[in-house]
Structures are given as C-alpha cells and as structure tokens.
Swiss-Prot record:
Its main location: membrane. It is found in: Spore membrane; Vacuole membrane. Pfam families: WTF. Belongs to the WTF family. One of its GO terms (cellular component) is vacuolar membrane. This is Meiotic drive suppressor wtf26. It is a multi-pass membrane protein. It comes from Schizosaccharomyces kambucha (Fission yeast). Keywords: Membrane, Transmembrane, Transmembrane helix, Vacuole. Homomer. Interacts with other proteins that exhibit high sequence similarity. The gene is wtf26. It comes from the Eukaryota. The chain crosses the membrane at residues 73-93, 110-130, 151-171, 188-208, 210-230, 243-263. GO terms for biological process: meiotic drive. Residues 29-68 are annotated as: Disordered.
Amino acid sequence: MNNNYTSLKSSIDEEGELKTDHEIDLEKGLLPEYNSEEEGALPTYSDHARSSNPPNTHRENHSSGTTDDSSPFLIKLLISFTPIVLLNALAVCYLTYKDAFFKDYGAAEWTLFGFWCLVCTLALIILTYFYETWTKAVKVTAIGLFNIRREMMIIIWILWLIICCILFGCVKDGRLNLNKALIYSTCTISAVLFLIVSSVCIPMWTLWRALSGMLQVLGIHGIIALLVNGSMSLFGKHFGWRGYEIEGFVLFFTGNALFLYEMERPGVLKRMRNTTGNVIGYILEGIGNIGNAIGRIGNAFRGANDNNDIPLGEMEVESEV
C-alpha cells in the first residue's frame, strides 16, 4: 500500500521557511542557540522572553508609590519652621530684655500677639508650599556668597570698622559707659566678629584654622594688655580715657591685621611665634656672649695683675729656665 503524502504547504510557504531559517538579521546578528535543559533559557530575540520579563519601570523601583525624589513632608515642614523659630527667638529675647514678655498684656497686646501668630502660620504654610523654590534660592545665594567670600570679608571688615568708630565715639562722648573696660569689650566684639566671618565667608574646612587664628590673636591681645597694664600698675600709674582709647585702637588694628594676614597666609602667627622665640634666643645668646667676653676681659685683667705681683727674682729664674 503506497502512502501518497501530499504536503498542504505551497511552494511559496516553503520558500518563506527556507528564508526564515537561513536568513540573518543584520541588526540582531546570529540567533543564540536554544538549550532546552536550562529553565527559562529562551533566545534573546524571543517575543515570549520580552513579554515574560518586562524591564523594570519607575513604579516598580518605587514600591511606595512616590514618583519624585522630593523630601518627605515632615522634613519640609521642619526646615520651613526653622527660620520662623529663629525670628521668634530674637523677638522673645528682646521682649525679655525689656521685661515685657507676657507682662501686663491688655486687649491691644493680645490682638497684636494673635495677629503675629497668624502671620507666622501663614509664613509656615507659604514656606512649606514653596519649599523647593526658597531652598533653591538660599542655595544659590550661599554659593554666590561663597564665590565672593574675599570681597565679603573686606565689606564686613569695613562695616565693622565703622561700627567700632561709632562705638568709640559714643564712649568718648559719655553716652556709653564701659567703666574703663574698652579694651576688653573690643576684644570680645572682635571675637564675635571673627566667629561670624569665619562661619559665613570662609569655607567650613578652614573654620578650625579661623578659630585657631582668632584665639592666637586674642592671646596676643591679652599678653599685650597684661604687659602694659601690669607695668603701669607696678609704677603706680593708671590709664586715663585717652590711654584706654589709644590702647584699644592699637589692639583693634593689630588684631585685624594679624587675623587677615593669618587667613591669607596660613601659619603666619605660628611662624611669627617661632621667629619671636628665635629672636629672643638670639638676643639672650648675644647677651651671654657679651657676658662671656666681659668675663674673658676680666680674667685677662686678673692675669695681668697676678703677673705684676710676682717678685723680680722669680721672674728671672723663670726666664733662665
């Protein structure tokens, strides 16, 4: 019995199969071999592999459902609340200083207090709502100030010089009584200024160097003050207002100059201290050498006197020998 098998495929279909079996996709290259023993080892170009292993989407990477990288709401609220707290802290300090903090409040005062609370609440809402905007503005401003920190240091120093001149003028006119402690107030205010300048206009990695320079300058101030005032006290003298003004001005300008020089050239004060020690050592060594020279001269004179005391007969015996 002859089995006449007739293919239902047409010649066109067979040609298509030959083409699909032997043609190479120029973009994908050769098809990888399929290994049935490995689980899920489907060819790379298989549509089934694409459908069963879809690429990770943004939503899968963020399982919590958030679609942005913004800060959480509580952190935004806390950061927005910080400037309001600082502003209110200044107001509380001022009212406490005036002894008017929640003291003898009437209707007008309580109305003003309620209005202030409303303003703070609205400010908190606005700062929280526009968090990205104002934080970006603060960052841009901080970067701009950081880039012009040298110019800012000069501007702050000029403003501080004007403030000190006004302060000294008030002291001289008697409108501000510091009880002859002008030098100590100058040192204190200079220390506060150094701290502000070092924390605002100088990068944080130089903050320790700035504080170190400030302490060294204040140490120089203290040493000069102790030497001058101590020597005046030993002789029973005391500074008048003119003396305190001169001393305060001298220490103020020397302190500013030394601090700026230290910030521009790190280690200047340390080298100055070493140089001062070396100079003092050289001076003491010179004084010692002068003392030794004087001692040698004295020994020479003593030797000459001893030779003059020797009898003439002994000198003749020594010469014959």
